[in-house]
Amino acid sequence: MKQTLLITLLSFFLFSAVAQDHFAPLDQWLERETPQMGGRAVLLIYKDDKLVYSNSENALTRRQKMAGRWMARRQKKEVNLDDFTPNSKIPVASCSKWLSAALVMTFVDEGKLQLSDTVGRYLPVLSQQGKGQITIRQCLSHLTGIKAPELKESLQQMKNISSMEEAIQQIAQMPVEGAPGTVFRYSNVGLQIAGAVIEKISGKSFEQLFADRLAKPLNMKQTDFGSKAVALPAGGASSTASDYMNFLVMILHKGQFNGQQILSAASVAEMQKNLVTDQVRIAYSPAEAGFTIGYALGEWVMEKGTEGSRTVSSPGLFGSFPWVDKEKGYCAILLCMSIKPEGRHERYQELKKLVDSLL
């Protein structure tokens, strides 16, 4: 019995050592790149029903930590700059779009909404301003045809908004640059409209809908859209690497998580269909996103596969990079803060290529 136990333990430690050795290039990449990604980063990789890689780096200098604490005090926030783990919560910016699109799809699954529904049916103010024929599908894919302001201006405008109704009234006044479905402009407006629609249908706040329909069943205990007057579906979520990984696992498993069907497989597949064809004019696409293939519902199509999209992703302004590779059967997330826009897409590609080579 003792001999069997000893052999089992030795085998376990030998396997662990080999696994650590195998992923050493990833450790080295994370250590090298973290100073360029805001000084703190977490990388998780999931394959074959388990986490196969988990590592974090904190490269903040003493001076950077002092500056961060001073800024936090000014903003009356609590901050821990000494630790950065898979359970550290940070704003994830446009990674929110993937979550919000999935939330909208829960209404599609229930038959309460169709992607072909026009928004004027639910929000008459948009019809009054000539925007009522925009569809829910176009809202989730940045194909509304609305010429939204630049990101900084858009966020500044949202600071003065006190209700979802006021946010939609503001969007209704924005100029149009093309017919719905003909122009791609990456912005916050489409997701904001979709968020207002599901609030209208349900009579509940966007934050509550997210908590009930996604956060709770996916055990995303530290993920939310804040407590501001108006939720920002396109970029207002805060999360942890561990929480967001649960969402990615659900997407990888065609809507299933822990034996529960959160989204239908059909909805997950619909979310991954590229809608930005050669006939669509690109009015604005962030350079750091590296527009190479297209955009679906709340997510970029990074790579084509044998059956449509192979890899889908939804990177955020602050540098976090979640992705799902359907053909290789894994998902991963790089969670970080303040990554520089220059060379960001190349860094994402380098990381994914390295991960692919190790799996």
Q: Where are the regions that the model predicts?
A:
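Bacterial Sec-dependent N-terminal signal peptides
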Residues: 1-21
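Short alpha-helical patches at coil-to-helix transitions and adjacent helical residues
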Residues: 13, 95-101, 133, 186-191, ...
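Catalytic loop of the DD-peptidase/beta-lactamase superfamily, centered on the K-T-G motif
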Residues: 20-57, 73, 158, 199-204, ...
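Active-site SXXK
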Residues: 30, 43, 49, 90-116, ...
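A short, polar/charged loop-to-alpha-helix boundary motif
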Residues: 61-82, 342-350
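Short, charged, amphipathic alpha-helices and their helix-cap/turn boundaries
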Residues: 69-78, 155-179, 204-224
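Active-site helix/loop module of the DD-peptidase/beta-lactamase fold
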Residues: 86, 91-95, 109-147, 151, ...
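Catalytic tyrosine of NAD(P)H-dependent dehydrogenase/reductases that use a Tyr as the general acid/base
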Residues: 90-93, 184-186, 321
